[in-house]
Amino acid sequence: MGGAKPRSWVVQAVVFGLVLAACGGTSVEVSDFCESVVETEAAISSGPGDDVAVWAGQLTETLTELEQLAPDEVAGAVGTITGILLPAIESGSEEALFAGLESTEFGEAAAVVDGYMTDECGWQVADVTAVDYQFETDLGGLEAGYNGFAFENAGTEMHEMALIRFNDDTTETIEELFELPEEEAFSKITMPGASFAAPGDSDTLFVDLEPGRYAIVCFLPVGATPDNIEALESGELQGPPHFSQGMLEEFTVAG
């Protein structure tokens, strides 16, 4: 974890940053929809692992359920999102998936869903602002359950908010964790979600948090801008990760 960010982590960051946000609601229908979106993001974040077919099947199932549960106010936007993602998943092409995720149509539809979720779901939402190179936020007082993170990039570079949960038996601080070999470090954490935003953009991430120790981290390399997104995604862009410049913060979620 101490070196330049691997391509797989960039891929997850971009996907999380572009995939619609979720929430919990004031009616059964809204609540079901919001929780379905959380499940969808969790399926995406898990990645294909060793069995792409199983992952694709699970993600297809969650997206189909999401479309069925969508309230009338966002049915069109959700239909646009699933109409972009499902064919790309079926094709098995990462290029097709990213072309869809980066399309104007997807971005506009995701923004509609974001707005609906923020207004209707009724979960606690913490504001997180990214600057070069730190997070400006107060994450004290978070409690277990569904929570939102309204992520805004006020910096000049691209930033992400990677949400990390320390395993219950992990004793290292986030700084100490990054001194360990990458494989050992990753064995001590899980990653419930992430948001990604270009300068001036924002994204809202909703996750179901368990009690425990957490941190938010930016893994993107120094120098990451919208002008070199292809080099970033391919892993060609080299530079110290933003967390090495101070872009990381620990917090605790109460039970």
Give names to the regions the model predicted:
Residues 19-22:
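C-terminal motif of bacterial Sec signal peptides marking the signal peptidase cleavage site
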Residues 24-26:
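Bacterial signal peptide processing site
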Residues 2-13:
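Bacterial N-terminal signal peptides that target proteins for export
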Residues 32, 36-86:
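Alpha-helical segments in soluble extracytoplasmic regions
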Residues 160-164:
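Beta-strand signatures of extracellular beta-sandwich domains
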